[in-house]
């Protein structure tokens, strides 16, 4: 039943380095919503489709890639019929089971639910309400490019199944409010038991409002939280907004804080926290600081046990800029936005970047802002944050809305908000890219607009990929200093194309298996398959 074929358009490559594709059974193109694949430890592949029409659909494929379950999840607490007031905060495998964290507005109050599914049948095993925030109908507190967060977040430990939930209340503080009970973090075991909870506040009240950056979990031992602390009114002796790195320990109901003084006055900060051994890294990105000779990126290293700052390094990428100048005809430095950080056990890392530019188009208030997702820059950094190797790939896509930094990091755990009522504008799942490193070779994957198919190669003005119907999946292979383009599903033609849902994809580094949803077009006909790509 599955179809097997390899990459066809290859010159003299080592056969072991050729990605091999397995296709599951055909099915109809998914409707508007959100899709996610999970390759479970038991060998099954779970395909979740959040449908605006049918609710949450779950399909399960066995190790032979045959469909063995097709069912609908019937939740009691979460209202599947009201998808437009729902956001996905994370989808993880925990304790061998698919676990889905959803947030939904209930009479304007954000409520978080946890759904646990059976790994064999897809049935709903348990559903719990984890928390609730006050109404979203309030004035935002926005000072010097820092917004008081009013939202909930979930992060899972990458090395275990412990996880944490953060609940941020960001409404203007009233006289009757307890300022020490506005932000709470819940620490859970793999069995979904609450093992600790902590209130997040500054004991000396030097900051009243907080903007969430990121969170990380280290087993049952620690929860780390990055925020920006700021005040609505300037207090005497107030140094302005600063980044805080905070730590919750099992023997405490409150956080210990490390204030990063060098971040005084920073605004609109993006970041990512990851744990490796005895160290914790927090990468910060401040777009306003991205100027000539300065990337706006700072790598901070903390002691995992104490949460104290060990060192702080400003990252720079001269080799990547040289690569861009030599191969993509750049005249100046590459100014990429960080999209995802892969931290290795030894402290070295891989940073995935993408060039962003923003523009306004049209009269609609909802869909006026757009983001160009441009060239790909990837740099492999040593333990000190210096470049070891770089990759540069030309790409041009456009998306409705403003794309934020670390979007690929969030997409990897399926963070998604169902806000766009126009299905044609929901192109996020097709855009940006993926990076697959294996020993001796690496691959960059994305959907491209191959306009030479339309023009016979005459079109000299590059057009961006804007609509899913124009997408064609390409795989760039980097080997021995050379770059080659592969078409894994066959050569695209004017009337024939192959596109993959990047947002639905799941990569298992142990098995080197990449699972995604493939949409094949032949004339006016379309069909979908789960595609497993072995790298």
PLM segments and residue spans:
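Beta-propeller blade signature
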Residues: 61-63, 112-122, 178-193, 238-253, ...
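Long, internal scaffold/assembly segments composed of regular secondary structure
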Residues: 215-228, 234-370
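Blade-loop segments of beta-propeller domains
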Residues: 26-28, 66-109, 129-146, 198-213, ...
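Loop/turn-rich, solvent-exposed surfaces of beta-rich toroidal or solenoidal domains
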Residues: 285, 338-341, 348-359, 367-377, ...
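Conserved blade-ending motifs and adjacent loop-strand segments that build the rim/top face
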Residues: 257-271, 314-333, 387-433, 470-472, ...
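Structural signature of eukaryotic scaffold interfaces centered on beta-propeller domains
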Residues: 28-42, 87-96, 142-161, 212-221, ...
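Bacterial Sec-dependent N-terminal signal peptides
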Residues: 1-21
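Short, conserved, GDST-rich strand-edge loop motifs in beta-rich repeat architectures
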Residues: 161-181, 228-240, 285-297, 354-372, ...
